[in-house]
């Protein structure tokens, strides 16, 4: 069951009810709190474009608590973050795994954060293939190219060498918030005194 809280806002013109995500959007906050698929990506991309159209100078805040998901859907979000004019601050709450960690690293340099108990997990892309040998070979080549592209971007975003990224993403690699900072996936760990 998916419950979405409603908030009531009172102004001099009366009361208005919002779902919590629409209310947060008014403050330029986007929440990525699920696995990443095409529907989630379309929603995030639409919100990013909307906020850019509203004000192309003000930062956008993308909160991430995601196990990851579709690589192509994730690239749609990543490319939009890189394309739009406003800086996107990324904040990991809970877990940013797989494509979630990739999007965490996609934030504006100096504006990528994690809460103290957040976890980040990086690994190579997952895929599967079935069918004739030729189709399996095509799928295998595609996932290898995708891995190469992801590793190249992660190396650019973190300052790590491609060789280190390849080694560190060969299997699931879990990092604490402090380790993610040391690795270059984020810039700072938010502390309670940062409120």
Curated annotation (Swiss-Prot):
- Kindly report, in one word, the top-level EC class recorded for this enzyme: hydrolase
Where is it predominantly found?
Answer: cytoplasm
Localization recorded for this chain is:
Cytoplasm
The record's listing under Gene3D superfamilies reads: 2-enoyl-CoA Hydratase, Chain A, domain 1
Q: Which CDD domains match?
A: S14_ClpP_2
Q: Which GO terms describe its molecular function?
A: ATP-dependent peptidase activity; ATPase binding; serine-type endopeptidase activity
Pfam family of this protein, just one? CLP_protease
GO BP terms: namely: protein quality control for misfolded or incompletely synthesized proteins
Keywords noted in UniProt: Cytoplasm, Hydrolase, Protease, Serine protease
Catalytic activities: Hydrolysis of proteins to small peptides in the presence of ATP and magnesium. alpha-casein is the usual test substrate. In the absence of ATP, only oligopeptides shorter than five residues are hydrolyzed (such as succinyl-Leu-Tyr-|-NHMec, and Leu-Tyr-Leu-|-Tyr-Trp, in which cleavage of the -Tyr-|-Leu- and -Tyr-|-Trp bonds also occurs)
| Subunit annotation | Fourteen ClpP subunits assemble into 2 heptameric rings which stack back to back to give a disk-like structure with a central cavity, resembling the structure of eukaryotic proteasomes.
The protein's job, in short, is: Cleaves peptides in various proteins in a process that requires ATP hydrolysis. Has a chymotrypsin-like activity. Plays a major role in the degradation of misfolded proteins.
- Protein name in the entry: ATP-dependent Clp protease proteolytic subunit
Species of origin reads: Staphylococcus haemolyticus (strain JCSC1435)
């Amino acid at each position: 069951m998916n419950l979405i809280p409603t908030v009531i806002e009172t102004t001099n013109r009366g009361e208005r009810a919002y779902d919590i995500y629409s209310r947060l959007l008014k403050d330029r906050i986007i929440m990525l709190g699920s696995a990443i698929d095409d529907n989630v990506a379309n929603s995030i991309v639409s919100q990013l474009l909307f906020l850019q159209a509203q004000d192309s100078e003000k930062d956008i805040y993308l909160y991430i608590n995601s196990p990851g998901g579709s690589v192509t859907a994730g690239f749609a979000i990543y490319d939009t973050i890189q394309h739009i004019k406003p800086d996107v601050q990324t904040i990991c709450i809970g877990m940013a795994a797989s494509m979630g960690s990739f999007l965490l690293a996609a934030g504006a340099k100096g504006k990528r954060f994690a809460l103290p108990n957040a976890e980040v997990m990086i690994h190579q892309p997952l895929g599967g293939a079935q069918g004739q040998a030729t189709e399996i070979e095509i799928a295998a080549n595609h996932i290898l190219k995708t891995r190469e592209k992801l590793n190249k971007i992660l190396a650019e975003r973190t300052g790590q060498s491609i060789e280190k990224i390849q080694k560190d993403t060969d299997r699931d690699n879990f990092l604490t918030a402090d380790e993610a900072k040391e690795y270059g996936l984020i810039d700072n760990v938010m502390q309670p005194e940062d409120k």
